[in-house]
Swiss-Prot record:
Quaternary structure annotation from Swiss-Prot or TrEMBL: Interacts with MOB1A and MOB1B via its N-terminal region at the plasma membrane and in the nucleus. Binds to BIK1 to phosphorylate and stabilize it. Interacts with and phosphorylates RBOHD upon flagellin perception to activate it.
Main localization category: membrane
Compositionally biased residues, Basic and acidic residues: 28-40, 606-618
Cofactor(s) named in the record: Mn(2+)
Domain Protein kinase: 249-503
Record gene name: SIK1
Residues binding ATP: L255, G256, K257, G258, S259, Y260, G261, S262, V263, K278
Protein name stated in the entry: Serine/threonine-protein kinase 1
CDD domains in UniProt: STKc_MAP4K3_like (cd06613)
Keywords on record: ATP-binding, Cell membrane, Developmental protein, Endosome, Golgi apparatus, Kinase, Membrane, Nucleotide-binding, Nucleus, Phosphoprotein, Plant defense, Serine/threonine-protein kinase, Transferase
Length: 836
C-alpha cells in the first residue's frame, strides 16, 4: 500500500478545479495496515517533523482515467501516425489563456512525503483529495479561520522539514472585459489591440501574484515566485513568443479572408523581407488550440526547399499570429485561372517532381499533408514550387469546420479517406494525381458534380483518367494511373513515384514556370488598371484586387473579378469552361478553395441598375414560352461562356424553345441563363459585339464543348454512375396493370405523365395533390425524344412505378427512405439526359 497510495490518489477523478490553487502536501505512512492506513489518511493523515524521503510526481488531470481513452484514440490513428513517439510535437502544457473547463493544460507538481515512523497522535490539518477543491478557495478568500490556522501550522512544519512547496497557478479570466470596446474594430485592429493589452517585456508573461496563496511567507514565497517564473516561460512552446508582431513587421495589405481568420502581406522591418501573416482568433477556435500549438512546434522542425517555411508564431490574449514564407507567384490554380490556360506537360512534370520531393520529406518525418491540390501548390516569383497550407491551417480548418459549414470540396480525396479507413501518406499521392489532371485540363475530375455526389462517385467508380488520350504522352498517362490506384496497398509512395519516368526524365528547372508567372503578372496589372479606371474607390479598396488575389498562400480563389456591367459577378472563366450539361448546382461548379475573395471593381450604379432591369426583362421573356430576342441557333448554353467567338453550335428552333422552357425548372440554370440573356439583348443576336474581354475561353475548351454537344445532339448519353440496375424494377417494365389502377397504353401515357411531373415539379417527392397547379406543356423536343427512345421510356416508366409505390403503398420508414432515394436517382438521371 505504501507504493500504491500515490497511484490510488491519482486514479480518482479530481474535483472541479477552482480558479486559484494553493499548496497541498500528501503524507503517506508505511507502517499501518492497508485498510486502516487508507481510512486514517482520509480522516487524519499523519505528519512528522523528521522526514527523510520525498517523492515528486506530476499530476495532470485524471491521468489513469484518461489512459483508456488515449488508448482508444491511439487505436483509431492511421498507421503512419501511430508510429509517432509519444512526445512528438510537444506535450500538452500549461495554457494560461485556456478556459477553466479545459483541464488538459493545467498541471503542477505534487510532493508526497512518505513517513516511515509510527503513527502520531496529532491530527493532521490535511484531509484527503476532496480538500483540493475546497480548502484552497477558502484560503484565497480568507473567510475560514480554521483553514488559516491549519495553513499557518503547515508553514511552521515546512520551516522545520525543509523548503518545499507545490502549487498550480492559473491566471484569472480576462476575456469578458474587452468585448464591448472591440466590436467595431477590424480584424487587424482587434488583434493589435489584443497584443498591446498583453505584457510584452519579454517572452515571459507576468503572473498575477494574487493567483497564489496569500498566506505563504519567507522562503516558501520566494520558492513559489521562482517556480511561477519557470512555469510561465515553459508553458508556451519556444516557437510561440509573446512579443508584439506589429513592432517587427509592417503590415501592407490584406490578402484574403477565410473561416480561420485573415491573411496579411507584411514586411520585416529589419530585413525588409516580405512575409505572409495569418491572424487567427483564439476565442473562436479554443477547442482545438492544444493541437494547434503542438502542430506549430512540429512545423518549426520542417526544413525543406519544397515546403513553405514557417518563420514563427506570436500569441496575444485573443489572437494567434503565424508568420510564414511569402510566395509571390501565387498558387498553380490561380495561375491557370488568370492566364485562362492549362499547363504544358513539361511544366506539369516539373511541378509534380518538386511536389513529390516535398511530400517525400513530409512523410519521412511522419507528416501527412492531407490537402494537396492546385490551390495549395504554391510558386515563388522565381518559379520554385512550395507546398503550403498544411499543419496549422489544416488543423484550424478542421477545428473551425465543427461549428461552421462544410469547408472545401472532396474532389481530391482518396477513397480510403472517404470510406473512413486508416490511411497514411499515400493519400497525398492520390491527391497529387488528381492535381495533375487539374493542371492538364484546368479543372479536377468531376468538377461539375455536386461535392456530396462526388464522395459517392469516388468510392464506387473507377479512378479518373486524362480525357484526351492523344494529347498527352504515355508516361504521363501511366504516372496519373499509378497515383490514382484505388487500392492503397498497391499505390506507390511519394519516394517511389520520384523514380517514375515521367518525373525522372524531367530536366527543366524553375525557369519552366517563368513565362506563365510573367504573363499572369501582366494580366493582373492590366486588370488593376482597368479596375481603377472604372471605379474610383480608395486605394485600400482596390489593393486586395488584381495582383494580390492569389497570394493568400494556398487558398484557391476566383482570380478574375468582373470588369464590365454585362458580366455575371461570380463567373470564373476557367472554373466554368468544362462544365457539361449534367451540372446540378450551376453556382458551385468551380470554386474549389476554402476561401473566396470577391472583387469590388464593378461598374457604376447606374450601369448595374440597368443591367439588373435587362436581366429581369430577358428572364421574363424566356419563361413565357418562346424567347423574344434569340434566334433559334443562338440560345446560350449553361456551359458556353465565350461571348466573343461566334457560335459554332447550331441548335434547332425546337430545341431552343425546349431549353428556354426547361430553364424554369431550375433556379440555378435560370440565374445563368438570364445573366447571359442580358448580354445578348444589349448587343443583339451577334454575340461577338459584346464587351466581355476577360471572359473568353481557349480553343481547347471549345473543342471539348463541341465534342460533348455532338454526343447530346446525336441522342447518345454519357454513363450515369449514380443509377443502379436494381432501381429498374422488372415489374415496372413487364406489367400492364401497375398499382393504383394506372393503365399503360401503347402510347406510354404513364411515362409521359411521369416526365411531365418531373418537368413541372422541382421536388421529385412531392405528393400528387400538390402537382398539377403549375403544369406546363411538355416541350415537343422532349416528347419526341421520349417516344422515340426505348431507354428513356423505360426510365420514365420506372419512375412512375416507384412514385406510385411511394405514394400509395403502406411502407415502413426504411422502405420509404429507400424509395425516396430511388426516385431521386431516377429524377437525376432523367434530368441529366434531357438536360432539364
Amino acid at each position: 500500500m505504501d507504493h500504491n497510495s500515490p497511484k490510488s490518489r491519482r486514479s480518482r477523478k479530481p474535483e472541479p478545479k477552482p480558479d486559484i490553487y494553493s499548496t497541498f502536501v500528501v503524507h503517506s505512512d508505511s507502517d499501518s495496515d492497508q485498510g486502516r492506513d487508507r481510512d486514517k489518511r482520509k480522516a487524519k493523515p499523519e505528519e512528522d517533523e523528521n522526514v527523510d524521503l520525498y517523492a515528486t510526481m506530476v499530476y495532470k488531470g485524471d491521468s489513469d482515467g484518461e489512459g483508456e481513452e488515449d488508448d482508444d484514440d491511439d487505436s483509431m490513428l492511421p498507421p503512419l501516425l501511430k508510429r509517432l513517439p509519444k512526445d512528438f510535437g510537444g506535450g500538452a502544457s500549461l495554457d494560461y489563456d485556456d478556459d477553466d473547463g479545459d483541464e488538459s493544460g493545467d498541471f503542477g507538481t505534487m510532493i508526497v512525503k512518505t513517513d516511515r515512523s509510527s503513527h502520531s497522535k496529532k491530527n493532521s490539518p490535511y484531509s484527503s483529495k476532496p480538500r483540493m477543491g475546497v480548502s484552497p478557495r477558502r484560503r484565497a478568500r480568507g473567510g475560514d479561520e480554521e483553514s488559516s490556522d491549519e495553513e499557518d501550522e503547515e508553514e511552521d512544519d515546512d520551516d522545520d522539514d525543509g523548503d518545499y512547496g507545490t502549487f498550480v497557478v492559473k491566471s484569472k479570466d480576462k476575456k469578458g472585459k474587452k468585448k464591448d470596446k472591440e466590436i467595431d474594430m477590424t480584424t487587424m485592429g482587434r488583434a493589435v489591440a489584443s497584443m498591446q493589452k498583453s505584457n510584452f517585456g519579454g517572452k515571459t508573461r507576468k503572473l498575477d501574484p494574487s493567483s497564489s496563496s496569500s498566506k505563504l511567507h519567507g522562503e516558501d514565497n520566494r520558492k513559489m515566485q521562482q517556480q511561477n517564473s519557470k512555469m510561465s516561460t515553459t508553458s508556451l512552446p519556444d516557437s510561440i513568443t509573446r512579443e508584439d508582431p506589429t513592432t517587427k513587421y509592417e503590415f501592407l495589405n490584406e490578402l484574403g479572408k477565410g473561416s480561420y481568420g485573415s491573411v496579411y502581406k507584411a514586411r520585416d522591418l529589419k530585413t525588409s523581407e516580405i512575409v505572409a501573416v495569418k491572424v487567427i482568433s483564439l476565442t473562436e477556435g479554443e477547442e482545438g488550440y492544444e493541437e494547434i500549438r503542438g502542430e506549430i512546434e512540429m512545423l518549426q522542425q520542417c526544413n525543406h526547399p519544397n515546403v513553405v517555411r514557417y518563420l514563427g508564431s506570436y500569441q496575444g490574449e485573443d489572437y494567434l499570429w503565424i508568420v510564414m514564407e511569402y510566395c509571390g507567384g501565387g498558387s498553380v490554380a490561380d495561375l491557370m485561372n488568370v492566364t485562362e490556360e492549362a499547363l504544358e506537360e513539361y511544366q506539369i512534370a516539373y511541378i509534380c517532381r518538386e511536389a513529390l520531393k516535398g511530400l517525400a520529406y513530409l512523410h519521412s518525418i511522419y507528416k501527412v499533408h492531407r490537402d494537396i491540390k492546385g490551390g495549395n501548390i504554391l510558386l515563388t516569383e522565381q518559379g520554385e514550387v512550395k507546398l503550403g497550407d498544411f499543419g496549422v491551417a489544416a488543423q484550424l480548418t478542421r477545428t473551425m469546420s465543427k461549428r461552421n459549414t462544410f469547408i472545401g470540396t472532396p474532389h481530391w480525396m482518396a477513397p480510403e479517406v472517404i470510406q473512413e479507413n486508416r490511411y497514411d501518406g499515400k493519400v497525398d499521392v492520390w491527391a497529387l494525381g488528381v492535381s495533375a489532371i487539374e493542371m492538364a485540363e484546368g479543372l479536377p475530375p468531376r468538377s461539375s458534380v455536386h461535392p456530396m455526389r462526388v464522395l459517392f462517385m469516388i468510392s464506387i467508380e473507377p479512378a479518373p483518367m486524362l480525357e484526351d488520350k492523344e494529347k498527352w504522352s504515355l508516361v504521363f498517362h501511366d504516372f496519373v494511373a499509378k497515383c490514382l490506384t484505388k487500392e492503397p496497398r498497391l499505390r506507390p509512395t511519394a519516394a517511389e513515384m520520384l523514380k517514375h519516368k515521367f518525373v525522372e526524365r524531367c530536366k527543366t528547372g524553375a525557369s519552366a514556370m517563368s513565362p506563365k508567372i510573367e504573363k499572369s503578372r501582366q494580366i493582373r496589372a492590366t486588370m488593376a488598371l482597368q479596375a481603377q479606371s472604372v471605379v474610383a474607390p480608395s486605394l485600400e479598396d482596390t489593393s486586395t484586387l488584381g495582383p494580390k488575389s492569389s497570394e493568400e498562400l494556398g487558398i484557391t480563389v476566383p482570380s478574375k473579378p468582373p470588369q464590365n456591367s454585362t458580366e455575371a459577378p461570380l463567373t470564373s472563366t476557367l472554373n466554368r469552361q468544362h462544365i457539361t450539361g449534367n451540372t446540378v448546382l450551376a453556382g458551385e461548379g468551380g470554386d474549389f478553395g476554402t476561401m473566396i475573395v470577391h472583387g469590388e471593381d464593378e461598374t457604376e450604379e447606374s450601369d448595374s441598375r440597368s443591367q439588373l432591369v435587362r436581366e429581369k426583362e430577358s428572364s421574363s421573356s424566356q419563361f413565357e414560352g418562346v424567347p423574344r430576342e434569340f434566334p433559334g441557333e443562338e440560345l446560350p448554353d449553361s456551359w458556353i461562356h465565350d461571348k466573343k467567338k461566334p457560335p459554332a453550335i447550331d441548335l434547332p428552333v425546337e430545341a431552343s424553345i425546349s431549353q428556354s422552357m426547361q430553364a424554369s425548372s431550375s433556379h440555378e440554370h435560370r440565374t445563368k441563363l438570364h445573366n447571359i440573356a442580358g448580354t445578348q439583348m444589349e448587343g443583339g443576336s451577334d454575340a461577338s459585339g459584346s464587351t466581355l474581354k476577360n471572359e473568353t475561353v481557349g480553343r481547347k475548351a471549345f473543342a471539348l464543348q463541341d465534342k460533348l454537344w455532338s454526343i447530346y445532339a446525336a441522342g447518345n448519353t454519357v454513363p450515369i454512375p449514380f443509377l443502379r440496375a436494381t432501381d429498374i424494377s422488372p415489374i415496372a417494365l413487364l406489367s400492364e396493370n401497375m398499382i393504383g389502377g394506372m393503365q399503360q397504353d401503347g402510347n406510354g401515357t404513364v411515362a409521359v405523365e411521369a416526365l411531365q411531373e418531373l418537368f413541372t415539379s422541382s421536388d421529385p417527392q412531392s405528393k400528387k395533390g400538390r402537382r398539377g397547379q403549375n403544369e406546363m406543356p411538355l416541350p415537343p423536343s422532349v416528347y419526341q425524344r421520349l417516344t422515340t427512345s426505348s431507354s428513356l421510356m423505360n426510365l420514365a416508366q420506372v419512375l412512375a412505378y416507384h412514385r406510385a409505390c411511394y405514394e400509395e403503398m403502406p411502407l415502413q420508414e426504411l422502405q420509404a427512405t429507400q424509395e425516396q432515394q430511388t426516385i431521386q436517382n431516377l429524377c437525376d438521371t432523367l434530368r441529366t439526359i434531357l438536360r432539364l
